[in-house]
Regions:
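A short, polar/proline- and glycine-enriched secondary-structure boundary/capping micro-motif
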Residues: 27-29, 100-106, 159-166
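Short, solvent-exposed aromatic-acidic interface loops
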Residues: 21-27, 94-100, 153-157
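Domain-core and long-helix interface of multi-subunit machines
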Residues: 111-115, 119-168
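Short acidic/polar alpha-helix capping motifs at helix-coil junctions
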Residues: 12, 102, 133-136
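Solvent-exposed coil/turn segments that connect beta secondary-structure elements
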Residues: 12, 48-49, 86, 96, ...
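Zymogen propeptides
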Residues: 1-75, 79-80, 88-91
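Extracellular/periplasmic catalytic domains that process cell-envelope and extracellular macromolecules
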Residues: 35-37, 74-75, 84, 131-134, ...
């Protein structure tokens, strides 16, 4: 079994990337503390960070943009989740130049162990045979009328072991 929370952001212009005060190899922050830093009512984990000795650091691995400004760039291509200046969700493999061309306002990225796209242009995708097992999950989507859907599923807990991609 699993449990999670779904946040519906009716105004996509309110969606933004929140970050630690400084990207360092020191310890990172938990989502709740980053949300407090921005007076946000909610948030989900995003991006990928350098793995420290005992915890993840506050140093992102790939592209991070906020308000159109590049805050971090590894110089390569990575899987990006972003929102454009006209509030459209963008998911794809790209570098900073492509993100700028697509008019991305805010984005985070992760390396290629991203999960599959579950729905594309309203059509459910075939995810049979995609590995990943039962784990904590975060998913993002956008409805046809522009609302942003943020789903966080708890995992590795007695009351919520996590979800598979098919569960999502």
């Amino acid at each position: 079994t699993y449990s999670g929370k779904l946040m519906i952001v009716k105004d996509p212009s309110r969606l933004f990337v929140g970050t630690v005060p400084e990207f360092t190899n020191g310890n990172g922050m938990v989502v709740a503390d980053i949300a407090k830093r921005y007076d946000a009512i909610g948030g989900v984990n995003g991006g990928e960070f350098v793995d420290g000795e005992t915890t993840y650091t506050a140093m992102p691995i790939g592209l991070v943009m906020k308000d159109g400004e590049i805050l971090n760039d590894n110089g390569g291509t990575s899987h990006v989740t972003g929102i454009t200046f006209d509030n459209k969700l963008v998911l794809g493999n790209m570098n900073a130049t492509k993100a700028k061309e697509l008019n991305i306002r805010d984005c985070v990225s992760i390396s290629n162990h991203i999960g599959p796209f579950l729905i594309v242009n309203g059509e459910a995708q075939d995810i049979v045979g995609i590995a990943g097992g039962t784990n904590p999950r975060t998913a993002i989507g956008q409805t046809a009328d522009g609302k942003i859907l943020l789903l966080a599923v708890d995992g590795r807990q007695p009351n919520s072991i996590g979800a598979t991609f098919s569960d999502l």
